[in-house]
From Swiss-Prot:
One Pfam family linked to the record: HutP
Keyword Transcription regulation set for record: yes
Protein name (Swiss-Prot/TrEMBL): Hut operon positive regulatory protein
Gene Ontology BP, a term: L-histidine metabolic process
A molecular-function term among this protein's GO annotations: mRNA binding
Family statement drawn from the similarity comment of this UniProt entry: Belongs to the HutP family.
Keywords: Activator, Histidine metabolism, RNA-binding, Transcription, Transcription regulation
NCBIfam families found in the cross-reference section: PRK03065.1 (NF002838)
Function in brief: Antiterminator that binds to cis-acting regulatory sequences on the mRNA in the presence of histidine, thereby suppressing transcription termination and activating the hut operon for histidine utilization.
Length: 146
């Protein structure tokens, strides 16, 4: 059960999330892997989660009718949000808002087939008071098995 050096799922997700719209990260996505990217901004953490889940389903990164896939994605999203929010997934209640780019990557990072598929969610953007100029950069990464 070795993590393949060329199949670092979290690194790939982070590079995709960090890339600006006009730049393309130099990545070689392994054959059979799936990914999507997008943006979300809100004072409501439920909207942030829903936007990422919708993107993953509409881009066929996860199957819409398989509960364990949605469940794995949810936990990866929550882990990434913990990083962005420093462990407090409250936004509107404490007058915080986020503007994030996200990447969701699904693949097989281990050399053993028994380890199965994994999903990584990377978030990069800003968090702060809902006043322009009152935010700072933040980053989060969540990885979970499917």
């Amino acid at each position: 059960m070795l993590l393949q050096g060329t199949h670092r799922i979290g690194r790939m997700a982070m590079l995709l999330a960090l890339a600006d719209e006009n730049e393309s990260p130099v990545l070689s996505i392994p054959k059979g892997w799936k990914y999507c990217t997008g943006k979300v901004g809100s004072m409501n953490s439920q909207k942030v989660v829903a936007a990422m889940e919708t993107a993953a389903k509409s881009n066929r990164v996860i199957e819409t009718d398989v509960y364990r896939e949605t469940h794995a994605l949810y936990h990866a999203i929550m882990e990434a949000l913990y990083g962005v929010t420093r462990g407090q997934i409250q936004l509107a209640d404490v007058l915080r808002t986020v503007g994030l780019r996200f990447a969701i990557v699904r693949g097989t990072p281990y050399d053993g087939k028994k380890e199965g598929e994994w999903v990584a969610v990377a978030l990069y953007g800003t968090i702060g008071a809902p006043v322009k100029g009152s935010e700072h950069e933040a980053i989060g990464l969540g990885i979970n098995h499917i």
